[in-house]
Swiss-Prot record:
<dbReference type="GO" id="GO:0005634">
    <property type="term" value="C:nucleus"/>
</dbReference>
<dbReference type="GO" id="GO:0065003">
    <property type="term" value="P:protein-containing complex assembly"/>
</dbReference>
<dbReference type="GO" id="GO:0016567">
    <property type="term" value="P:protein ubiquitination"/>
</dbReference>
<comment type="similarity">
    <text>Belongs to the DET1 family.</text>
</comment>
<dbReference type="Pfam" id="PF09737">
    <property type="entry name" value="Det1"/>
</dbReference>
<dbReference type="GO" id="GO:0031625">
    <property type="term" value="F:ubiquitin protein ligase binding"/>
</dbReference>
<dbReference type="GO" id="GO:1990756">
    <property type="term" value="F:ubiquitin-like ligase-substrate adaptor activity"/>
</dbReference>
<keyword id="KW-0539">Nucleus</keyword>
<comment type="subunit">
    <text>Component of the DCX DET1-COP1 ubiquitin ligase complex at least composed of RBX1, DET1, DDB1, CUL4A and COP1.</text>
</comment>
<dbReference type="InterPro" id="IPR019138">
    <property type="entry name" value="De-etiolated_protein_1_Det1"/>
</dbReference>
<comment type="function">
    <text>Component of the E3 ubiquitin ligase DCX DET1-COP1 complex, which is required for ubiquitination and subsequent degradation of target proteins. The complex is involved in JUN ubiquitination and degradation.</text>
</comment>
<protein>
    <recommendedName>
        <fullName>DET1 homolog</fullName>
    </recommendedName>
</protein>
<dbReference type="GO" id="GO:0031464">
    <property type="term" value="C:Cul4A-RING E3 ubiquitin ligase complex"/>
</dbReference>
<dbReference type="GO" id="GO:0044877">
    <property type="term" value="F:protein-containing complex binding"/>
</dbReference>
<dbReference type="GO" id="GO:0032436">
    <property type="term" value="P:positive regulation of proteasomal ubiquitin-dependent protein catabolic process"/>
</dbReference>
<keyword id="KW-0833">Ubl conjugation pathway</keyword>
Length: 550
């Protein structure tokens, strides 16, 4: 027996040559239903392999690409206007980079480097329109934007602080019996939602919410599903539902909160005539309504019926024991599951108004049918049943790529590698000090409801194509801590290093006492990405693109 012969055979790496892959695609169609996946593999050959550090940009705040990749939006430096750019393609600056070898154009002072950094932005992005949106002292929220499915329009939000003097009237602040008490951590503001036509730059429609609290950051307080837009008023505990028309206008559909049907006021006024009389004279006082808010009433009825179905006296006693606490629950977040169903998170008023930030506070998730006005299900934030639904049907909560003909969601329910990451995270919490299974469930369900359009569809973040450290970059479009080293992307099928992304400046001493954040914006399908590093008030913009070295 020859002991020098290894019994472990090295893994055979598939041919990575792009010509070979093109020829293979030509002569072999592959398994049925895998055509799009086979085409997507070519992103392992065409990737953003070149970084230009510290690109000069106009005085604006960069936001994101439209889902079809044609447009890029930004907010003006004074946050009153929306700037609409047309993307010119990943090859737009290839002539500028002729002769450059390597992977990085650093922050050099030579004339050519300075010229490239100064001209690069206008090569990739051509300004089409500047639309003045915010008025009356309002400022656009830089983290709020929703694109319609046809990529024709974009919805943005603006807000203006209310002055201390004169203080708004009491019944403007408290418009129904569920209204919360504002505080300095959660101040009241005047809000406006605007819809702009990307093709013409025209401001098509605006809806205002005076003396209110709507969480605009990261689209937390508004959700767009196809042509249905839902907006949660945290202050008034009301969900406003609109239909977005192809022409870019808002149509009132329903208002959910104090009432669930539009004609509920007529029914109530038959029993309480003073409600109708006060409404007609402009002296309405719904804050002192003698009845329970309609949406809250449906929640309580569902819980009571569930206690009755249980059949035990203990279930009914628990309902009575916690009845007052259930009445004090307030809506915190919500999302649309489809055109008819809302997914609402209820918690205590202290959490809703940011008086308490303890994530261990009890909360409930409610599935509500807007058409039939029925509560379909209620889950606690420690529910194993809801976690199982979330893990197995995560894509239905994300609605990440509704606009795409072909879906490539990179979630725990559709991607083995994303599932592994989630399992590791779950096991880490279970085994941690003060952890455990219940804490792991609470932490995982803390992601719900999921904000609209908060996940990138870029193939370079697809975990089935590339392996990378999700600590530094991920499919969720949120700022990440900036690392000291480049982010490396390895091909999933071969394990070979394909490209690196360098965020921030090179060669500068790193101050670890200052928190450095970086936000990535990937093009939906082309090999192009933008990273914006923020350190205190300083912004560094890097472009990551495809460059053919000659």
């Amino acid at each position: 027996m020859d002991h020098h012969v290894s019994t472990i055979k090295p893994r055979r790496i598939q041919n990575q040559n792009v010509i070979h892959r093109l020829e293979r695609r030509r002569i072999s169609s592959g398994k049925a239903g895998t055509h799009w996946h086979q085409v997507r593999v070519f992103h392992q050959n065409v990737f953003p392999n070149f970084t230009v550090v510290n690109v000069e940009k106009p005085p604006c705040f960069l936001r994101k690409f439209s889902p079809d990749g044609r447009y890029f939006i930004a907010f003006s430096s004074d946050q009153t206007s929306l700037e609409i750019y047309e993307y010119q393609g990943c090859q737009a600056a290839e002539d500028l980079l002729q002769g450059y070898e390597g992977e990085i154009l650093s922050n050099g002072n030579d004339q050519r480097s300075v010229s490239i950094r100064g001209r690069l932005f206008e090569r990739f992005f051509v300004l089409l329109h500047i639309t003045n949106v915010a008025a009356n002292g309002e400022h656009l929220n830089r983290e709020c934007s929703l694109f319609t499915d046809d990529c024709r329009c974009v919805i943005v939000g603006s807000a203006a602080y209310l002055p201390d003097e004169p203080h708004p009237p009491f019944y403007e602040v408290y418009r129904n019996s569920e209204s919360v008490t504002p505080n300095p951590r959660s101040p009241l503001e005047d809000y406006s939602l605007h819809i702009i036509d990307l093709h013409t730059g025209r401001l098509c429609d605006t809806r205002t919410f005076k003396c209110d609290k709507v969480v605009l950051s990261h689209n937390q307080g508004l959700y767009l599903y196809k042509n249905i837009l839902a907006i949660l008023s945290v202050q008034q505990q009301t969900i406003h539902v609109f239909q977005v028309t192809p022409e870019g206008t808002f149509i009132d559909v329903r208002t959910i909160g104090r009432f669930c049907y539009e004609d509920d006021l007529l029914t109530v006024s038959a029993v309480f005539p003073e409600v109708q009389r006060d409404s007609q004279t402009g002296m309405a006082n719904p804050f002192r309504d003698p009845f329970i808010n309609s949406l809250k009433h449906r929640l309580l009825v569902y819980l009571w019926r569930r206690a009755e179905q249980d059949g035990s006296a203990m279930a009914k006693r628990r309902f009575f024991q916690y009845f007052d606490q259930l009445r004090q629950l307030r809506m915190w977040k919500m999302q649309l599951l489809d055109e008819n169903h809302l997914f609402i998170k209820y918690t205590s008023e202290d959490v809703v108004t940011l008086r308490v930030t303890d994530p261990s506070q009890a909360s409930f998730f409610v599935v509500y049918n807007m058409v039939t006005t029925e509560v379909i299900a209620v889950f606690e934030n420690t529910s194993d049943e809801l976690l199982e639904l979330f893990e197995n049907f995560c894509d239905l909560f994300r609605n990440a790529t509704l606009h795409s003909e072909v879906q490539f969601p990179c979630s725990a329910s559709s991607n083995n590698f994303a599932r592994q990451i989630q399992r590791r995270f779950k096991d880490t919490i279970i085994n941690a000090k003060y952890g455990g299974h219940t804490e792991a469930v609470r932490r995982l369900l803390g992601q719900l409801p999921i904000s609209a359009q908060s996940y990138s569809g870029s193939p370079y973040l697809d975990l089935s194509l590339f392996s990378y450290d999700d600590k530094w970059v991920s499919v969720m479009e949120r700022p990440k801590t900036c690392g000291d080293h480049p982010i490396r992307f390895y091909a999933r099928d071969s394990g070979l290093l394909k490209f690196e992304i360098q965020a921030g400046l090179l060669g500068r001493p790193i101050n670890h006492t200052v928190r450095r954040l970086v936000a990535f914006t990937f093009h939906p399908f082309e090999p192009f990405a933008i990273s914006v590093q923020r350190t205190n008030a300083e912004y560094v913009v890097n472009f990551h693109m495809r460059h053919c070295c000659t």
